[in-house]
């Protein structure tokens, strides 16, 4: 008799806990479904899930879609360079876009080799 009374008391208290927690779980699930926004990959236009999400220059990518435009090598956040919304590995970015020419000319100065040419002429006139 003692066991039957204990079992009867345990059942209602357990049901009360279960009923309250299931309604709480349902509310939190419905809230989280409304809060999620589908994000699409800038490269393939497919849905990006949080585990594969990568953001570079305010664009969202799958980690597998974030690759060099020139050689298609997979990029990481520390190994890319961007120009006009296109992404490149650092070696190809330098190869494709580095400035060709002389820095001295770019800043309006005489070329370095011209400065040395004048110094070679001057030592002959120098007196020791």
Swiss-Prot record:
Keywords of this entry:
Acetylation, Cytoplasm, LIM domain, Metal-binding, Nucleus, Zinc
Q: What Pfam families does the record tag this protein with? A: LIM
User: Which cystines does this chain contain?
Assistant: none
Q: Which InterPro entries does this one have?
A: LIM_LIMD2 (IPR044115), Znf_LIM (IPR001781)
Q: Where in the cell is it found?
A: Cytoplasm; Nucleus
Q: Which GO terms describe its biological process?
A: actin filament bundle assembly
What job does this protein perform? Answer: Acts as an activator of the protein-kinase ILK, thereby regulating cell motility.
Instruction: Kindly provide the name given to this protein in its UniProt entry.
Output: LIM domain-containing protein 2
User: Which SUPFAM superfamilies would you find in this protein's record?
Assistant: Glucocorticoid receptor-like (DNA-binding domain)
Where does the LIM zinc-binding domain lie? 39-99
Q: Where does Zn(2+) 2 bind?
A: 68, 71, 89, 92
> What PROSITE patterns is this protein classified in?
LIM_DOMAIN_1 (PS00478), LIM_DOMAIN_2 (PS50023)
- Domain of life from the UniProt record: Eukaryota
Modified residues annotated as N-acetylmethionine in this record: 1
Residue span of region Disordered = 1-25
**Chain positions recorded as Zn(2+) 1 binding sites:** 41, 44, 62, 65
């Amino acid at each position: 008799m003692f066991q039957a009374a204990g079992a009867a008391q345990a059942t209602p208290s357990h049901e009360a806990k279960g009923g309250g927690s299931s309604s709480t779980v349902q509310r939190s699930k419905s809230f989280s479904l409304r809060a999620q926004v589908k994000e699409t990959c800038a490269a393939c236009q497919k849905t990006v899930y949080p585990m594969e999400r990568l953001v570079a220059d305010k664009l969202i990518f799958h980690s597998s879609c974030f690759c060099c435009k020139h050689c298609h090598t997979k990029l990481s956040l520390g190994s890319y360079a961007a120009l006009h919304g296109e992404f490149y590995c650092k070696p190809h970015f330098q190869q494709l876009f580095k400035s060709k020419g002389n820095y001295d000319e770019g800043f309006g100065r005489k070329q370095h080799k011209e400065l040395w040419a004048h110094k070679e002429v001057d030592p002959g006139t120098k007196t020791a």
